[in-house]
Amino acid sequence: YNALGWYTEAPPDSERRHVREHTPRHERVLQQTFRQFADHPQDWRDFLDWFQQMPLFIDAGRFRLVHACWDDSLIGALKADYPDGRIDRDFVVASAVPGSFANRVFERLLRGTDLRLPQGLTLTSEEGFTRAYFRTKFWEDDPQTYGDVVFQPDALPDNVASLPLTPTDKGRLLQYGLDEPMLFVGHYWRRGRPAPLRPNLACLDYSAVMYGKLVAYRLDDELQIDPNKFVWVEVERPEAPQ
């Protein structure tokens, strides 16, 4: 989406030129990709065409796939026009309008749920981005504090983690139930040994781009995620030129 939005013109009434505004921050996210494709323009065009064909979700009945968060309500509505999750250019264009259905779909499925940090606080991530929000779990059964729901590499300060969630905070959270199909997500930059988050939920993003692990799961006929079926390779940091 970051790449498609960078090249897709926004609607005339959206007060921006492109769906993904050409800010230094947005450019930084794509910088390495641009650099690696600089001498391969046709390959890059082919990749952009491929990105446009990729589904935003896969619902195979027994298991599901989504980048960041499964939202039954949004996905159900999306299926009405895009049953297989493959959206078109018009949908990307529509996402330039904040609060539009397309915008809410991309924000939720590709970015997940989040909460604003209390008391005007901000956090600076390992990548150098300063944020006023933090990523949250979308499966916690009965969370009471900020620490119960935080789900990101950068920990909350202890004095923030212990603060109670307000009713408004709780209303912004989702709950993916234990009775739902197995769900595999990425997005969250995990560390350590790959393992399920719950019997029906696993994250396969273990920070490969930051020299972590490139992770997969060997799926057979099981109905719950088997901790012994994660497979991975360690991503080696390249040696510096002599």
Segments predicted by a language model, with ranges:
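Regulatory N- and C-terminal appendages and interdomain linkers associated
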Residues: 214, 223-240
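Intrinsically disordered, low-complexity boundary segments flanking structured domains
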Residues: 43-46, 54, 170-172, 190, ...
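Active-site neighborhood of divalent metal-dependent phosphoester bond hydrolases
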Residues: 1-115
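Alpha/beta-hydrolase fold catalytic core
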Residues: 99-192
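Generic low-complexity segments that are intrinsically disordered, proline-rich and/or Lys/Arg-biased
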Residues: 12, 119, 228, 239-242
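Conserved beta-sheet core of the metallophosphoesterase superfamily
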Residues: 79-88, 174-226
